[in-house]
Amino acid sequence: MKISKVVIRRMSLDFKVPFRTSFGLNTRKDFSIVELHDSDGNVGCGACSAFWRPWYNEETTEGALFVIKEFLVPSLFDAGDFKDPEWFFDHTSWIRRNRMARASVDCALWELYSKELGIPEYKALGGVRNEIEAGVSLGIEDTPDKLLKTIEKYMNQGYRRVKCKIKPGYDIQYMRAVRKEFGDIMLMVDANSAYTLNDIDLFKEMDELGLLMIEQPLASDDIVDHRHLQAAIKTPICLDESIDSVDDARRAIELGSCRIINIKVARVGGLIEARRIQKLAGEKGVYSWCGGMVDDGVARGHNMAVATLPYYRYPNDIPGSDRYYADDIVTPSTYIDSHAKIQLPDLPGTGFELNRAVVEKHTIEKWEFTK
C-alpha cells in the first residue's frame, strides 16, 4: 500500500430529531471524513466520529483533526509502500490514545486495501456472513408514554431489539411500561455511566425485567465497581466506554466485570483492534456487538463490515440511513428489511461511495495533502 494523496473534510449534519442521553441533548453531529488515494485511482474513506465537545471521551472534532493532520498524515507518507492496514496500525502505536483519530485512518486504509484486493471489506477482515441484524437505539423521552409511541414506530419498521437510554428518574418505571406494553421484545438499557454502586438495589429490581443487557451502568473508566455489580445481579452487564483496547477487554473479563462487550470501531481505534477484541473475548465466551456513534454513512459502512466477524452475536446499533439524518453522504443508502436485517454489498471496499453533492453541501472545511 502506498498513499499518494489525503483529503480531509470537516463536516456537520443536523439530527432529524434531537437525541438525548444522560450527557445531555444533541442537535447535530460534527465529524470528519478522511479520503486516502493510491496511485492506481483507488480511494478509501474513513470517518472520525469524535463529537464537538468531549462528553463521550476526551477526544473532540478539533483535537482529532489536529492529530490526523499533524501526525497521522505525515506517518502515512513516511511509511512509503507498506504491507497492510495492520502494519500501519502497529507502526503508529506510539500515538497515545487519540483512538477516534486513528480509527478514521485505519478504516480508510481497510477500504483502500480491500479495493486493491478486489474483495469486499468484510471478507478482507474475515467476516463470516453477508448480512447483519440491526437494533434501534432510543434517547431519553419526557414520559413513558412518549417512549412507548417511539418504540411502536420502530417495531413497525421491523426492528426486534430496542435499546433505551436511561438516567436516574428515567429508568425502571419506563422499562416496566415497555415490558407491559410490548411483552418479550429484546430490550436493553444504556446508562452512559449515570449510576454508582449506591444504586445497586435499583439494578437488582431491573432483574425482574428480563433485559438483554445493561450497558455501561457505572463510571466510564471503571472495571472494578462493575465487577461487584455484575456479581450482585443476574442481568448481563455490557461494557462500552470502559473498553478501549484488547488489554482492557482481557482485564475486564478476568475480573468478571461484564458478560458482553459493545465494540465501537471509533472508540477502540479502528477495525484492527475491534477484530482483536472480539476474538479474545469470544474465545472466553464473552460475545460482542457493534455499537454506534450516531454515525454518518461512511462510518456505518465500516460498522457493517466489522459486525460480520464471528463473535459478534447480538443485534447491532447499525440502523438504516434514514434513522438520524435527512441527507445520506454515501450511495447507495442502507435500509433494513422486515426482519431488521441489512445485506452487505458484494463489492470491493465497503460497497458505498461518497455522494459528492451531499458531501460538498455539508463540508465546513477541506484540506488536501500530497507527498
What are these regions (language model features)?
Residues 5, 37-116:
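Metal- or metallocofactor-binding catalytic centers and their adjacent structured scaffolds
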Residues 123-233:
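Metal-dependent enolase-superfamily TIM-barrel catalytic cores that perform enediolate-based chemistry
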Residues 3, 34, 41, 72, ...:
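Conserved, mostly hydrophobic/aromatic
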Residues 221-238, 243-341:
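Shared catalytic-loop signature of beta/alpha-barrel
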Residues 48, 136-138, 164-166, 189-193, ...:
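A cross-domain feature marking catalytic cores of carbohydrate-active enzymes
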Residues 323-371:
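C-terminal extensions of enzymes
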Residues 1-44, 49-55, 323-327:
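Structured beta-strand/loop patches that form or line metal/cofactor-binding pockets in enzymes
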Residues 1-5, 114-115, 119-131, 342:
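N-terminal amphipathic alpha-helix/helix-capping segment at the start of soluble metabolic enzymes
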